Amino acid sequence: MKFIDEALIRIEAGDGGNGCVSFRREKFIPKGGPDGGDGGDGGDVYLIADENLNTLIDYRFEKRFAAERGENGRSSDCTGRRGKDITLRVPVGTRAIDNDTKEVLGDLTKHGTKMLVAKGGYHGLGNARFKSSVNRAPRQKTNGTPGEKRDLQLELMLLADVGMLGLPNAGKSTFIRAVSAAKPKVADYPFTTLVPSLGVTRVDTSRSFVIADIPGLIEGASEGAGLGVRFLKHLERCHVLIHLVDIAPIDESDPADNIAIIEGELFQYSEKLANKPRWLVFNKIDTLSDEEATARAKNIMQRLGGEDDYYLISAATGKNVDVLCRDIMDFIEENPRQEQEKIDAQEVKFKWDDYHQEQLSEQVFTEDDQEGDDWDDWSEDDEEGVEIIYKP
């Protein structure tokens, strides 16, 4: 299945149903008072995280989703039916962004998490709501309010504990094949990896972590060169980044310069991502003797002004790979993922109960209204269905 990690869709919540103007007219009760019902609320639009999905391909062609409108009110004090909600299923790790305001509406990072992205309109009021001691036959009603409509940008960010960085052909796909059951394509030409892939590394029977492999970066990636930095967003939720470096590049390029290129592109993309814990791992030491590999790594670190804090591995032969994986597992356990801070709900400025009260209080009565035929013909007793006539 094609990997799609971005989608732009149009969502429309349902409008609220209108109120009804109606009067009770039955045998022996010719003027029984107002009985217009309220409309129904419009349907909402939700997103729900589904662990069985791993791509946004479902939203590549179908891009418009609309909830049902609320029904209008009817006579006999019948309230209109509420519009049906719609729920869109997305992969775990999806972020919802308002495309117009660029506001992040939320992240769906757990299976079954449900998020409201468009609120349906509220119902209008029927004329029965407006009856009072001075207005016994009201002809006022209110219409339902429009539902929210927005263009929604969906971005899928893979949930992994470890992310891998490096130039093309640094051995990232070979490494993930060596430590997990994932089988990304491996070849001796650049950009063999075209889409991100995930693998589960099991250190022992009870401990494991998820590792993400993304396409390699090249110089100028932040400006769109190569595959660009489009896939770097998949590393934003990782505990630690593994910077894989070919210690003996076949093109005879300088590994120190290659490290500097990746570091520079990372900082240009995101300072937050650049400040994540990052481990330097020299790969392909099987092409050199142990002494030569150690000497070359020390020379590179001295030129970069860094400490002797690095790993020497061979993903192809598996040399020192187990040690690296166990150290990664220990680091993850010592630094658990921080839960997102819960934001206290803020009091909304617009309250529908207040809105309805305002609609009722803003009604204006004129002398023409009071001189109408129905103004003084209805009494409280009519609501019981029997007209009471008092003997003089």
Swiss-Prot record:
GO cellular component: cytoplasm
Obg domain ranges (all copies): 1-159
Molecular function GO labels: GTP binding; GTPase activity; magnesium ion binding
Binding site for Mg(2+): 173, 193
Record's compositionally biased regions (Acidic residues): 365-386
Subunit record text: Monomer.
Family from the record: Belongs to the TRAFAC class OBG-HflX-like GTPase superfamily. OBG GTPase family.
Protein name: GTPase Obg
